[in-house]
Amino acid sequence: MNGNEFGRLFRLTTFGESHGDAMGCTVSGVPAGVELSEEAIQEDLDRRKPGQSMITTSRGEPDKVSIKSGLQDGYTTGTPIGMVIQNKDARSGKYEPFITAPRPSHGDYTYSAKFGTRNWGGGGRSSARETVNWVAAGGVAKQVLAQSDYDVQIKAHVCQIGDVVADDVTWEEMLEHSEDNEVRCGDPDAAEEMRDLADEYQKEGDSIGGAIYFECRGVPRGLGAPRFDSIPARLGQAMYSIPAVTDFELGIGRDARTATGTDYTEDWEFGESEATASENASGDEPRARGDPKPVGNDHGGIQGGITTGDPIYGEVTWHAPVSFPKTQETVDWETGERKEITVTGRHDPVLPPRAVPVVEAMLYCTVLDFMLLGGRINPDRLDDRPGEYDTDYHPSSPRNDPEDADTHATTVDED
């Protein structure tokens, strides 16, 4: 099976099935010298894990991450970082009826058709549980960026569930409110309506779709490449890889369909400059000025597939979860019968509340990959000091050799 890797220099490779022993990933391309905190990665995993509220699946997974490689004394060494998350609460019995009677709108039939077999417990590899690996990798990327010379900040919140749409919120409102409610919405009033709506569908044995708004700040200008490695192309791959995503928008997105060229085009002006004109400069000489800057940001921080330095923003849309208790119809290819089925496993009635950290993680992974590709961050070492070996993150020699050591080193008197 291919398609298990994402990224060019910062590369994520994942493994695991929903009801297997464990989930895991290998992250390569992490520069040496990053002080990596397992606890910080865990914080993001806790935001994604199941069982957080009454509108999430009741599956009791602690999602505890364990870093297995790539660290020495708490610092990255430049070698691949391996992480494992054990599955603790898998119950595959309820999925046995669907081995040859595929659930509607799932990957059951298509996986069997492609490979001639599949891991059927909990959906196996096609389950959204696999995104736990992405959040772990995003936690690594987030820490690399936080310790770099760039102040990259990324935040997302649920902007719509069903027909309940949140008001536009500021960056500060997202930071203040989105983690204060079960649906992770930056608009507290809309959050209550969204919560009630999700609860209503859950009680009816049904589900509902929704959307997430995201914003990236501090991304420097000049990242991305024309055509197939453009920022929109790579972000689109990242977002459409998330299970159940049906739409991805940048900037004003679908509203561009009704905008005229004169409305959508943004003029250029000089931004503010930190520099000032010389005290003795004559009035005829040009004064210090800032860099060219677009007037407005309908383009979402990207022009020609390359970043402008303005905030990158957009929306991601999910269809309703297709596992729910209401009766559905399918066919059993082994018996040749039509069957009525009820999917009674533990499932979310709406996906965006738990998908917020997934979106943020994939944004962090994508932005860091472009920063490495663009030379903004040294891919070998974070301190960008090639050839220097006596660093504050290099392991120190022991003061005394262990008594049972087979080898030893003693100081030589140079006199």
From Swiss-Prot:
Protein's pathway: Metabolic intermediate biosynthesis; chorismate biosynthesis; chorismate from D-erythrose 4-phosphate and phosphoenolpyruvate: step 7/7
Keyword Flavoprotein on entry: yes
Basic and acidic residues composition-biased segments: 379-393
Needed co-factor(s): FMNH2
One GO BP: chorismate biosynthetic process
Record keywords, A-Z: Amino-acid biosynthesis, Aromatic amino acid biosynthesis, FAD, Flavoprotein, FMN, Lyase, NADP
GO MF assignments: chorismate synthase activity; FMN binding
Binding site for NADP(+): 48
Entry's cofactor comment: Reduced FMN (FMNH(2)).
Sites where the protein binds FMN: 125-127, 304, 319-323, 346
Reaction(s) this enzyme catalyzes, per UniProt: 5-O-(1-carboxyvinyl)-3-phosphoshikimate = chorismate + phosphate
Entry's EC annotation: 4.2.3.5
InterPro entries linked to this entry: Chorismate_synth, Chorismate_synth_AroC_sf, Chorismate_synthase_CS
Keyword set includes NADP: yes
Family matches, as PROSITE patterns: CHORISMATE_SYNTHASE_1, CHORISMATE_SYNTHASE_3
Annotated segments matching region Disordered: 43-72, 262-310, 379-415
GO-annotated cellular components: cytosol
Regions of compositional bias (Gly residues) in chain numbering: 298-307
Top-level lineage group: Archaea
Annotated family: Belongs to the chorismate synthase family.
Function: This reaction introduces a second double bond into the aromatic ring system.
HAMAP family recorded: Chorismate_synth (MF_00300)
Protein name: Chorismate synthase
Gene responsible for this protein: aroC
